[in-house]
Amino acid sequence: MKAYFIAILTLFTCIATVVRAQQMSELENRIDSLLNGKKATVGIAVWTDKGDMLRYNDHVHFPLLSVFKFHVALAVLDKMDKQSISLDSIVSIKASQMPPNTYSPLRKKFPDQDFTITLRELMQYSISQSDNNACDILIEYAGGIKHINDYIHRLSIDSFNLSETEDGMHSSFEAVYRNWSTPSAMVRLLRTADEKELFSNKELKDFLWQTMIDTETGANKLKGMLPAKTVVGHKTGSSDRNADGMKTADNDAGLVILPDGRKYYIAAFVMDSYETDEDNANIIARISRMVYDAMR
C-alpha cells in the first residue's frame, strides 16, 4: 500500500512538473510575440517558489544601471551586521562627496554643505529614491566597488560584474556597460537575499525588503499593470540616451508576493532601445503582468 501511494505521489509530481514546464514555454512564446518588431534587446528571468526558472536572452550581459544599488545595499548591511552597527548610526557627509551633475534628491535637501545623516536614511535615499550620491557614499562605506563585487561573488552568484561607481558610470557612455548581469544572476541574488539568513540581525533583512517595497521610482514598470495592492519589492534602473537616440537600459528587478502568499522573483532588462521611455516601461509592465497571470 505504501509503495502504491508513493507511486501516485510521484505521478502527480511528474504531471505538475510537466504542466509548469508547459506554462513557462507558453510564457516565452507570448514574450516573443510582444517583442516582435521592437528595436531593443530584452532579457527576462523568473524564478518561482517551486524552483522553476524562465530564462529569456539569458546569455546577454545587460547593463544594470541603478539596479546595482541592491548589490551595494547587501554589502553595506553585511558590514553593519559583522560590526554590530545600528541602522540609526550617524555618518558625516562632506559637501565634496555630493557632486551636482547627477540625480540626487539628497543634494537638493543639503545643497553645498556638510551634514550628518543616519545609515537608515542614506540607504533609503539610495534604494527607494535611487539617489546616485547616496549610492557612492555607501560604496565607499562598504569598502569600495571591488569589495562589493567580491562579496556578491562569495554568495555564489556569478554571471555579473561590478567595477563602476555611479560617478564612474557617468564618466563615459561606454562605462555603463561595465556593471552588468544576466537576468538569471539577478533573480538568484534576489532569492538568496530573501530566503537565506545573510545577517544575524533580522532587522537588517526586514529593513532591506521594506525599503525595496517603498521604492518610489519606476511605478510604471514591474508594478505598472499589476493589481493595485500587489506587494512588490523592487529596484529600478534607467540610463540616458546617446546622440542617436538609443537608450542603454531601462530595468526593473524584484520580488512579487501573490495574494496567497506565494512569491516569485523577476528581472526585466531592456537594453540598447530605440523605443520611447513609455514603450520600454510598457514592455516591462506587460511581461510582468504575463508572469503574474501565469503564476496564479
Swiss-Prot record:
SUPFAM superfamilies cross-referenced by the UniProt entry: beta-lactamase/transpeptidase-like (SSF56601)
Binding residue positions for substrate: 235-237
Residues spanning the signal sequence: 1-21
Any one GO MF annotation of this record: beta-lactamase activity
Biological processes annotated in GO: beta-lactam antibiotic catabolic process; response to antibiotic
Pfam entry (one): Beta-lactamase2
The keyword Hydrolase is assigned to this record: yes
Domain of life: Bacteria
NCBIfam families: bla_CblA, bla_class_A, SubclassA2
Family per similarity comment: Belongs to the class-A beta-lactamase family.
UniProt protein name: Beta-lactamase
Species, as recorded: Bacteroides uniformis
Organismal lineage: Bacteria, Pseudomonadati, Bacteroidota, Bacteroidia, Bacteroidales
Gene: cblA
